[in-house]
């Protein structure tokens, strides 16, 4: 396959280098990734300033470019400019840390894959779910094995897979729902060396979903969480209720 690999941790991150190297043993791999970390940029794109592309070296088997854009920009540039619209699969990652629950709305990693899904190209976001001790190689090797078994024709149009891999021994994988996992944010007030006040965002994770088949519970139990997601955000049940009342 011709595989496009991107991420939000940047072109020099260990996660993308390990993933690209291992995928290139069996596939034609193109890396197009941000020239610096773009974590938590969501699905932003660049429209008011130029985008620059620079060829970089990762290995002999991998064609790689850095860009000044976001992960979504990288996918657009790769598809339309670098790869001449010949892409069989898009993989975004391996991210350092989980992308579960409401994280996916902020995640540049997920948005890179979602951009592919919006083009109706098979797309996967993959994350090593332990931020402090990420196992990039373990996640990459899981993905390689998964690609040999998974039938992408089972996915609905414009649908991608969000994969979170636990560190350590993997018991198996589970298809999961996106959880209600979220953050309680607060801001720590600090003072610069120049005496100027500034704020640093902090947060505490909230994991109180009462459903059993959600992403973070699978990861906590040692399973890879695989969640099919899409860009369409309409709450169908609420829409039906509103129409019944107001139409």
UniProtKB/Swiss-Prot annotation:
This is 5'-nucleotidase SurE. Its cofactor is a divalent metal cation. The keyword Magnesium does not apply. GO terms for cellular component: cytoplasm. The gene is surE. The keyword Cytoplasm applies. One of its GO terms (molecular function) is 3'-nucleotidase activity. It comes from Thermotoga petrophila (strain ATCC BAA-488 / DSM 13995 / JCM 10881 / RKU-1). Its main location: cytoplasm.
């Amino acid at each position: 396959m011709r595989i496009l690999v991107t991420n939000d941790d940047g072109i020099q991150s260990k996660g993308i280098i390990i993933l690209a190297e291992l995928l290139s043993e069996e596939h034609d791999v193109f890396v197009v990734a941000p020239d610096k970390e773009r974590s938590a940029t969501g699905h932003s794109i660049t429209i008011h300033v130029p985008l620059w592309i620079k060829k970089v070296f990762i290995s002999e088997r991998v064609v790689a470019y850095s860009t000044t854009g976001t992960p979504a920009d990288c996918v657009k540039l790769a598809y339309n400019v670098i790869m001449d619209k010949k892409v069989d699969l898009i993989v975004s990652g391996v991210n350092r840390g989980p992308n579960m629950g409401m994280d996916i709305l902020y995640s540049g990693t997920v948005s890179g894959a979602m951009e592919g899904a919006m083009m109706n190209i098979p797309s996967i976001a993959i994350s090593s779910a332990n931020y402090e001790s990420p196992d990039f190689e373990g996640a990459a090797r899981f993905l390689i094995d998964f690609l040999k078994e998974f039938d992408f024709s089972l996915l609905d149009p414009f649908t991608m897979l969000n994969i979170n891999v636990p560190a350590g021994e993997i018991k198996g994988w589970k298809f999961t729902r996106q959880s209600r996992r979220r953050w309680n944010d607060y801001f720590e007030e600090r003072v610069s060396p120049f005496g100027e006040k500034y704020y640093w965002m902090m947060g505490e994770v909230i994991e109180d979903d009462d459903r059993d088949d959600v992403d973070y519970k699978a990861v906590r139990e040692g399973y890879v969480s695989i969640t099919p997601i899409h860009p369409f955000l309409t709450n169908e049940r609420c829409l039906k209720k509103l129409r019944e009342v107001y139409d």
